[in-house]
Amino acid sequence: MVYKYDFLIIGSGVAGMSYALKVARAHKGKVCMICKTSLDEANTSFAQGGVASVTNLEVDNFDKHIQDTMIAGDYISDYKAVKQVVTMAPEQIKELVEWGVNFDKQQDGKFDLHREGGHSEFRILHHADDTGAEIQRGLMEAVRNCPDIDIKENHFAVEIITQHHLGARVTRRTPYINCYGAYVLNPETQKVDTYLSKVTVMCTGGCGAVYQTTTNPVIATGDGEAMVYRAKGTVADMEFVQFHPTALYHPGETHPAFLITEAMRGYGGILRLPNGESFMEKYDKRLSLAPRDIVARAIDKEMKKHGLDHVCLDVTHKNPEETKHHFPNIYAKCLSIGIDITKDYIPVRPAAHYMCGGIKVDLNGCSSINRLYALGECSCTGLHGGNRLASNSLIEAVVYADTAAKHSIEHVDEYDFNEKVPAWNDEGTLTNEEKVLITQSVKEVGECMSNYVGIVRSDLRLKRAWDRLDLLYEETENLFKRVKVSKELCELRNMINVGYLITRMAIERKESRGLHYTIDYPVHAYDKK
């Protein structure tokens, strides 16, 4: 089957839905959103903390938020991107509220603001401790009520279509690579359909599932980054993987591991060893409120030093009723496994959480491939640099959805559908009846990345990861050519591509910076004398 849409959106989180709503109301053409699972199962739903925006101008200002972001990014953030997100944030917050998103307010009607690690002021808007789910709910309601958006749930994008599929030779040096749409797997027919578009927008979210333990759902397999890389697009900063310092330690729950939000440390939570001894004073003067990379490395070091599988977060000294009010979901979750957080320590450990790199884009969300935009976690805007400041990601997605929508609405009439695109060819392939080949390889990718490309790295570990991934790549590509396409096989292929990109860029960065810490190059390159 061949479908034609002026705007084709791959992904359904805050970035994809915000963009869809903005272009739909412009009435510049047909809009389609491809959802890998159901519309409500995006990575956005798992974000607990909140949305960073300067709203209390009595004590806060844009310069402070910009400075906090630059410091957290270890001074390699793109200043223009930082300024754009920070200054546009308040207006985008208003739009979220107009779409039906609720943020907690104080009795005087002002927003109830949290403060999180790395922020110099209280500026985190939130909805209790499930802000992501509330944003997803509000946007999802608006999208479902919009008759101009076609939603294709449980459909899987296999590849983006470029002139390569028309027989042209495309390399990373090819100027003006064009995107003509995507090949998409239909779950009902198990056939790959052709979706032609004038504009394609990648909003596929993160890639935490390439690690053994992650706060991301199992669907976060780096599909967007992998598809664009294979299409010879530019991908950047993939070595900067953020590990959330405090995922709930509960063996068996790894995809996703339950997130203990940063706001709990902003609220006054103290990191301790199981024996009650605090340890952050040894690592940073900001103690438990230090940026995530510092806290994650500190926890990792203490766990290795003492042979522990977790450390603890302590909020037992806080008012029990306040704790329950601010963190109802965390309280309920911990209680369900026998932990009363008002009386007991919370067992926590780091887990893969956020990809700061991704598909390289400009201030309008344009990638290096013509007619292809990338938004949200799968993109690399330059905002995060070497490390993401807490709660900057949801607002980044909304801001770039706005700039990309304006840019694509302005230019969509310049493009035509490419009618010469061939149908997906799977002649001569077999139905794969040995799923164990896929499930075992997925497990191997997770073990390889966690053991060798984790919080602390070395040349030796990275070389071992490279070799293991190379072998998995050869095996999986051979399987891909031999059998019919399946979602599971495509995800494995994408995970291997993303694992390779993280490893390669980690090898190439001969310094420690931000989230990338290697024992062979423990300082910044410019610190060496």
What are these regions (language model features)?
Residues 77-90, 123-141, 152, 214-222, ...:
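Short beta-strand to alpha-helix junction loop
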Residues 72-112:
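Rossmann-like flavin
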Residues 1-6, 19-22, 29-30, 38-40, ...:
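Glycine- and aromatic-enriched mobile tails/lids
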Residues 12-14:
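Glycine-rich Rossmann-fold phosphate-binding loop(s) that bind the pyrophosphate
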Residues 97-191, 196, 203, 247-251:
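Conserved redox-cofactor binding core of oxidoreductases
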Residues 37-70, 74, 242-246, 255-256:
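Conserved N-terminal glycine-rich FAD pyrophosphate-binding loop of Rossmann-like flavoproteins
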Residues 39, 227, 233-340, 346, ...:
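An anion/pyrophosphate-binding glycine-rich loop and adjacent beta-alpha core
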Residues 159-171, 175-176, 180-189, 339-383:
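FAD-site-proximal beta/loop scaffold in flavoenzymes
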